[in-house]
UniProtKB/Swiss-Prot annotation:
Keyword Transferase part of the UniProt annotation: yes
Phylogenetic lineage: Bacteria, Pseudomonadati, Pseudomonadota, Alphaproteobacteria, Hyphomicrobiales
A Pfam entry, by short name: PhaC_N
Key words, A-Z: Acyltransferase, Cytoplasm, PHA biosynthesis, Transferase
Subcellular location: Cytoplasm
Name this protein carries in UniProt: Poly(3-hydroxyalkanoate) polymerase
UniProt record similarity statement: Belongs to the PHA/PHB synthase family.
Active site feature: 341
Length: 605
């Protein structure tokens, strides 16, 4: 049974008129806020960010989709067949709608997938008019997707970009986003006399002002979280700080710990506390509770001073310096290291460099949703061709970094229905403030990228794939992953669109030692932040080395219920089972500089 439908009360036109006048005034204020980046400052100069942020993306989208259209125009017969197919689909839909309007029951011509929440309200199916709108949108969208999929004469990168940009367009123009084509929004607007739009426009104005004229759609209540209290909660101490990172040592909760400490290298594209969201979801806290001395790098949120910090800088001043400081703090020369996402790519680069130079202090490596071979990289590869990278480099040259908002927008575009338009509708049309949610607080806590580092990463990994080809050079050393012989734990997640499971699987073959490939459920974040307990729902698969075809490995792998965290702990323990008395951070050769989570994590983009 669907949601019970009730007839709305008659609209209060006096209230609607009053709210319409107020809405016009708030709209005027919002328009003024959106023009702030274009206002003159001083002697007529434009404020930073005066160029329209989305212009380059719109130009690229237009060029890409035009190339697809041109391939169809070159084959009129095939284009006519496609148009005929679309016409037949709409004829069937119109016939079905007329039949429904005569009181008969008909099967829908097309339906949204069960996971599509946009059309969940009963009126989308019960009301013939809105059902027609919904099915028309779905038919046109699927026809457009098929046009891209079957276009001939375009390379796969262009096709991938076209699919990506088409997904953005279809998400933006969904009838669920607009009052007059969404029955639920229309009902609410009439019942409230437009007060929901008033609240929404006020939030839009606030978000434009907060973004300096650029719209930053709020996803959560940013005032609801405090570091050390609500997020990044595991106790510890900052025991070292340099220009690029703070090194945090976490306080033990067991009397003894594994002798070999663990260094976690998070990505610098976002902040480390995704691994320490709260006591229930903290991978860091859970590893501490198992008796591991955990160290974590907290990267600086860079500014113009860091423009020349490149991949080698992050290796030397990040991972290698952290290992040195761990030795000072604990007396241990050997460490286990774990890298997450691009932090894992940096860890792999460091391992290859150390293998070439005879420095072998990292005795085991764990990679969490990490790519070393970018042949089958995820949707972010859409932004990585020569033209787009040059445009990014030109933009970074202005200030020495890539703005955090641009990187955050790129990640949000990977899931536009969930991470963009659902919040646009909720905030600005329904007029509802988003709820407090720690994961979305972290998602909104953007970081900048130094120009030299980001350019190296885009060109050497996404564009030219030099690490996988044995062509990457760092510190005048050519890197060869086959020389990396340490045991490797390589975690992928089944639904990852950033580091696809296939990409991680094939990257496993690039290492020269034993690799334990593990496939967890869910995606890039939820598949990693998957604590043990009664709520552990995704499970994971193990099957030893990643050999042969990915599909064959999955079919033959053993499926396990629950979290992969205990499996990983056992793997670490097997590498070095010796235990020693627990180490108290800040009491040895390196005194505490600040309590965890430190100062760098608090820097805003």
């Amino acid at each position: 049974m669907g949601t019970e439908r009730t007839n709305p009360a008659a609209p209060d036109f006096e209230t609607i008129a009053r709210n319409a006048n107020q809405l016009a005034e708030v709209f005027r204020q919002s328009a003024a806020a959106s023009l702030k980046p274009f206002e003159p400052a001083g002697q007529g100069a434009l404020l930073p960010g005066a160029n329209l942020q989305g212009a380059s993306e719109i130009d690229e989208m237009t060029r890409t989709l035009t190339r697809v259209a041109e391939t169809w125009l070159k084959d009129p017969e095939k284009a006519l067949q496609a148009q005929t197919k679309l016409g037949q689909s709409f004829a069937a839909l119109w016939a079905s709608t007329l039949t429904r309007m005569q009181g008969a029951v008909t099967e829908p011509v097309v339906q949204p997938p069960p996971t599509d929440k946009r059309f969940a309200h009963a009126d989308w199916s019960a009301n013939p008019v809105f059902d027609l709108i919904k099915q028309s949108y779905l038919l046109l969208g699927r026809w457009a997707e098929e046009m891209v999929e079957t276009a001939e004469g375009i390379d796969e990168h262009t096709r991938h970009k076209a699919e990506f940009y088409l997904r953005q367009l279809l998400s933006a123009y969904s009838p669920s986003n607009f009052v007059m084509t969404n029955p639920e929004l229309l009902r609410q607007t009439l019942e409230e006399g437009g007060a929901n739009l008033m609240r929404g426009m006020k939030m839009l104005q606030e978000d434009l002002e907060a973004g300096g004229g650029q719209l930053r759609v709020r996803q959560t209540d940013l005032s609801a979280f405090t570091f050390g209290k609500d997020v990044a909660v595991t106790p510890g101490e900052v025991i070292f700080r340099n220009d690029l990172m703070e090194l945090i040592q976490y306080a033990p909760t067991t009397e003894t710990v594994l002798k070999r400490p663990l260094l976690i290298v998070p990505p610098w594209i976002n902040k480390f506390y995704i691994l320490d969201l709260n006591p229930q979801k903290s991978l860091i806290g859970w590893m501490v509770s198992q008796g591991i001395t955990v160290f974590v790098i907290s990267w600086v949120n860079p500014d113009e001073r860091h423009r020349d910090k490149d991949f080698e800088s992050y290796m030397r001043e990040g991972i290698e310096t952290a290992i040195d400081m761990i030795g000072v703090a604990t007396g241990e020369t050997d460490v286990a290291a774990a890298g997450y996402c691009v932090g894992g790519t940096l860890l792999a680069v460091t391992l290859a460099y150390q293998a070439a130079t005879g420095n072998r202090r990292i005795k085991s490596a764990t990679f969490l949703t990490t790519q070393v071979d970018f042949t089958h990289a995820g949707d972010l590869k859409v932004f990585a061709d020569e033209g787009q990278i040059k445009a990014i480099e030109e933009r970074m040259a202005e200030h020495g970094y890539l703005e955090g908002a641009r990187m955050a927008n790129a990640f949000n575009m990977l899931r536009p229905n969930d991470l963009i338009w659902s919040y646009v509708v909720n905030n600005y049309v329904r007029g509802k403030a988003p709820a407090a949610f720690d994961l979305l607080y972290w998602n909104a806590d953007a970081t900048r990228m130094p120009a030299a580092n980001h350019s190296f990463y885009l060109r050497n990994c996404y564009l030219n794939n030099t690490l996988a080809k044995g062509q990457m050079v760092l510190g005048n050393v050519r890197l060869d992953l086959k020389k990396v012989k340490v045991p490797v734990f390589n975690l992928a997640t089944r639904e990852d669109h950033i580091a696809p499971a296939l990409s991680v699987f094939e990257g496993s073959a690039k290492f020269g030692g034993k690799v334990d490939y593990v496939l967890a459920g869910s995606g890039h974040i939820a598949g990693v932040v998957a604590p043990p307990g009664p709520k552990a729902k995704y499970g994971f698969r193990t099957g030893g080395p990643a050999r042969g075809r990915f599909e064959d490995w999955v079919a033959a792998a053993t499926e396990h219920p629950g979290s992969w965290w205990p499996y990983w702990y056992k793997w670490l323990e097997e590498q070095a089972p010796e235990r020693v008395p627990a180490r108290i951070p800040g009491t040895g050769a390196l005194p505490s500089l600040a309590p965890a989570p430190g100062t760098y994590v608090r820097m805003k983009a």
